[in-house]
A protein has these predicted regions:
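Conserved helix-loop-beta element of the AMP-binding
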Residues: 53-55
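Alpha-helical substrate-recognition element adjacent to the catalytic core
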Residues: 29, 57-62
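Solvent-exposed beta-strand sheet faces enriched in polar/charged residues
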Residues: 57, 86, 241-245
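Phosphate-binding/catalytic loop of phosphoryl-transfer enzymes
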Residues: 61-165, 311-315
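ATP-binding/phosphotransfer module of carbohydrate and carboxylate kinases, centering on a glycine-rich
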Residues: 1-45, 49-51, 75-76, 95-101, ...
Length: 315
């Protein structure tokens, strides 16, 4: 994009993009996305750098040591003059509000939260699962909990639940034990547990008590995380936005949304829940324009252009 907010190219590159510690950084994949979007603007990577500022909002940038590590890795490719790295949660927050501060919550495969105060102070969480004290941490957890509930209902350790039937049906087997065995023998990728999250919401909508209990646990962890950030930044008496982004928030479960709203408003009555309806890349682009001190008209133009411009060359 240009500093006046014109979109010069847009690409969705569906490839391996895990920058978590201990993984081989997917720099070639990221470079391919940059090459393709630059080509739309008539720029080749041979004429590096391709931009003045590169704003990278990446999953896996969870700790300060991650920020330093990934920044070094990206700078080593010389794609842009100035590398700015953020966790993807900051893109969610910026895409959902023009205040410049507030709270952003991402709930997809995992759960994370970042908050910015009106004075610029930042609160973020490691979001490393059980390792960092997270409890009901996102859609991956919800899927695993669904399998656990199905197994416990079947063997008598827990209450009966419609998940006993719905979980194995999703994977085209007859018993939840078969799903467990497939995971144990690595015949089934553990990442596929995320596919069960919509099943839990469907079961809860049908009146399944155990599914509703799991959804309530997830909502309560979202509330606890957001409220911790709100208290730490002393936002409890202020008016601000809480932006909710990620696949879990695209469900249509009114009780889930209401529980989150009521739980946060109990601590911060002036908080307004906003479900993100724009792609997170809008937030990354706006953060880039913020860094360039672009005019408000440029930011408004960017929002409008990205809203009407499909992300090209989907893969």
């Amino acid at each position: 994009m240009s500093v006046d907010g014109a979109v010069l190219g847009s690409v969705r590159h569906r490839a391996y993009a895990n920058f978590n510690f201990g993984h081989e950084p997917p720099l070639d994949s990221l470079g391919e996305a940059i090459r393709r979007v630059a080509a739309q603007a008539g720029i080749t990577l041979d004429s590096q750098p391709v931009a003045k500022v590169g704003l990278f909002c990446l999953a896996g940038a969870d700790l300060p040591l991650d920020d330093r590590r990934i920044t070094r890795q990206v700078k080593g490719r010389s794609w842009v003059d100035d590398v700015m790295l953020r966790n993807d949660t900051f893109a969610i927050l910026r895409a959902g509000t023009d205040r410049g501060w507030g709270v952003g919550v991402v709930c997809g495969s995992g759960l994370n939260c970042a908050a910015v105060g009106p004075d610029g102070r930042i609160v973020r969480f490691p979001a490393l699962g059980e390792l960092s004290g997270d409890l009901a941490h996102g859609g991956g957890w919800l899927g695993r909990a669904a399998l656990g509930a199905a197994l416990r209902g079947r063997d008598g350790r827990g209450p009966h639940t419609s998940l006993e039937k719905m979980v194995p049906e999703h994977f085209k087997v007859k018993r939840p034990e078969s799903v467990m065995e497939a995971l144990y023998t690595l015949e089934l990728d553990s990442q596929r547990m995320l596919e069960l999250a919509p099943i839990v919401f469907k079961a809860a909508a049908g009146g399944d008590v155990e599914s509703r209990r799991l959804i309530d646990e997830l909502a309560d962890e979202i509330i606890a995380t957001a409220n911790a950030a709100i208290r730490r930044l002393r936002l409890t008496r202020l008016t601000f936005d809480v932006v909710l982004g990620g696949g879990i928030f695209r469900n249509h479960d009114g009780a889930f949304t209401a529980r989150i709203r009521d739980g946060i408003n109990a601590v911060a009555p002036g908080a307004t829940m906003r479900r993100l309806d724009a792609p997170p890349v809008v937030g990354a682009a706006l953060l880039g324009l913020d860094a360039l001190k672009a005019k408000p008209a440029a930011k408004e133009r960017l929002r409008k252009e990205l809203a009407k411009t499909p992300l090209a060359s989907r893969r």
